[in-house]
Amino acid sequence: MGNICCVKCEMCHQKYSRKKIHSKKICYKCLLVPVNQINNSPSNNSIHKMNYKKNHEMNHEANHVSHIINTNDTDWYVQRNKRKYHPNPSDSRYGSRCFSAGLPVGFG
Protein backbone atom coordinates (compact mmCIF):
# COMPACT_ATOMS: atom_id res chain seq x y z
CA MET A 1 0.00 0.00 0.00
CA GLY A 2 1.33 3.49 -0.50
CA ASN A 3 1.28 6.53 1.64
CA ILE A 4 -2.00 8.47 1.63
CA CYS A 5 -1.89 12.19 0.91
CA CYS A 6 -4.48 14.90 0.41
CA VAL A 7 -4.71 16.41 -3.09
CA LYS A 8 -7.13 18.45 -5.16
CA CYS A 9 -9.12 16.83 -7.93
CA GLU A 10 -8.17 18.23 -11.36
CA MET A 11 -11.81 18.29 -12.46
CA CYS A 12 -13.90 19.49 -9.50
CA HIS A 13 -11.05 20.93 -7.35
CA GLN A 14 -12.36 19.21 -4.21
CA LYS A 15 -9.78 17.85 -1.80
CA TYR A 16 -9.64 14.09 -1.44
CA SER A 17 -7.19 11.53 -0.14
CA ARG A 18 -5.41 9.22 -2.54
CA LYS A 19 -2.57 6.79 -2.55
CA LYS A 20 0.70 8.14 -3.92
CA ILE A 21 1.05 5.20 -6.27
CA HIS A 22 -2.18 6.20 -8.01
CA SER A 23 -1.21 8.37 -11.00
CA LYS A 24 -4.55 10.06 -11.74
CA LYS A 25 -5.47 13.20 -9.84
CA ILE A 26 -9.22 12.68 -10.17
CA CYS A 27 -11.55 11.99 -7.25
CA TYR A 28 -13.90 9.03 -7.19
CA LYS A 29 -16.99 11.15 -7.97
CA CYS A 30 -15.39 12.49 -11.15
CA LEU A 31 -14.33 9.00 -12.16
CA LEU A 32 -18.03 8.04 -12.14
CA VAL A 33 -18.84 10.74 -14.73
CA PRO A 34 -19.63 9.11 -18.10
CA VAL A 35 -16.59 8.83 -20.34
CA ASN A 36 -18.16 10.83 -23.20
CA GLN A 37 -18.19 13.95 -21.00
CA ILE A 38 -14.47 13.66 -20.32
CA ASN A 39 -13.22 12.19 -23.59
CA ASN A 40 -12.23 14.70 -26.27
CA SER A 41 -12.72 12.44 -29.27
CA PRO A 42 -14.12 14.24 -32.36
CA SER A 43 -17.57 12.65 -32.17
CA ASN A 44 -18.04 13.42 -28.49
CA ASN A 45 -16.60 16.88 -28.98
CA SER A 46 -19.12 17.67 -31.73
CA ILE A 47 -21.96 16.42 -29.51
CA HIS A 48 -20.67 18.64 -26.72
CA LYS A 49 -20.51 21.65 -29.09
CA MET A 50 -24.04 20.97 -30.32
CA ASN A 51 -25.39 20.76 -26.76
CA TYR A 52 -23.48 23.90 -25.81
CA LYS A 53 -24.93 25.82 -28.78
CA LYS A 54 -28.45 24.63 -27.94
CA ASN A 55 -28.08 25.60 -24.28
CA HIS A 56 -26.53 28.94 -25.26
CA GLU A 57 -29.47 29.77 -27.54
CA MET A 58 -31.98 28.80 -24.84
CA ASN A 59 -30.17 30.97 -22.28
CA HIS A 60 -30.03 33.85 -24.77
CA GLU A 61 -33.80 33.74 -25.32
CA ALA A 62 -34.42 33.36 -21.59
CA ASN A 63 -32.35 36.50 -20.99
CA HIS A 64 -34.53 38.44 -23.45
CA VAL A 65 -37.70 37.27 -21.71
CA SER A 66 -36.38 37.99 -18.23
CA HIS A 67 -35.26 41.47 -19.38
CA ILE A 68 -38.78 42.23 -20.64
CA ILE A 69 -40.38 40.88 -17.45
CA ASN A 70 -37.98 42.66 -15.09
CA THR A 71 -37.94 46.06 -16.81
CA ASN A 72 -41.28 45.99 -18.66
CA ASP A 73 -39.30 47.33 -21.62
CA THR A 74 -40.64 45.98 -24.89
CA ASP A 75 -39.62 49.01 -26.94
CA TRP A 76 -36.05 47.79 -27.51
CA TYR A 77 -37.39 44.53 -28.97
CA VAL A 78 -39.83 46.34 -31.28
CA GLN A 79 -37.16 48.81 -32.40
CA ARG A 80 -34.75 45.97 -33.12
CA ASN A 81 -37.30 44.31 -35.39
CA LYS A 82 -38.11 47.60 -37.14
CA ARG A 83 -34.45 48.15 -38.01
CA LYS A 84 -34.42 45.07 -40.22
CA TYR A 85 -36.03 46.94 -43.14
CA HIS A 86 -36.06 50.68 -43.79
CA PRO A 87 -38.45 51.66 -46.59
CA ASN A 88 -37.10 54.42 -48.75
CA PRO A 89 -39.65 57.28 -49.00
CA SER A 90 -38.52 58.08 -52.55
CA ASP A 91 -39.04 54.48 -53.67
CA SER A 92 -41.45 54.25 -56.62
CA ARG A 93 -43.29 51.36 -54.99
CA TYR A 94 -44.76 53.79 -52.47
CA GLY A 95 -45.92 56.31 -55.10
CA SER A 96 -44.48 59.21 -53.14
CA ARG A 97 -42.90 60.83 -56.21
CA CYS A 98 -46.26 61.40 -57.92
CA PHE A 99 -48.53 63.75 -56.03
CA SER A 100 -50.44 65.30 -58.96
CA ALA A 101 -53.62 63.27 -58.67
CA GLY A 102 -52.81 61.34 -55.52
CA LEU A 103 -52.46 58.20 -57.61
CA PRO A 104 -49.62 55.71 -57.59
CA VAL A 105 -46.75 56.15 -60.02
CA GLY A 106 -47.83 55.53 -63.60
CA PHE A 107 -51.33 56.90 -63.12
CA GLY A 108 -50.54 60.58 -62.56
Swiss-Prot record:
Keywords: Lipoprotein, Myristate
Residues where lipid is bound covalently (N-myristoyl glycine): 2
Record's protein name: Uncharacterized protein L806
Organism: Acanthamoeba polyphaga mimivirus
Organism phylogeny: Viruses, Varidnaviria, Bamfordvirae, Nucleocytoviricota, Megaviricetes
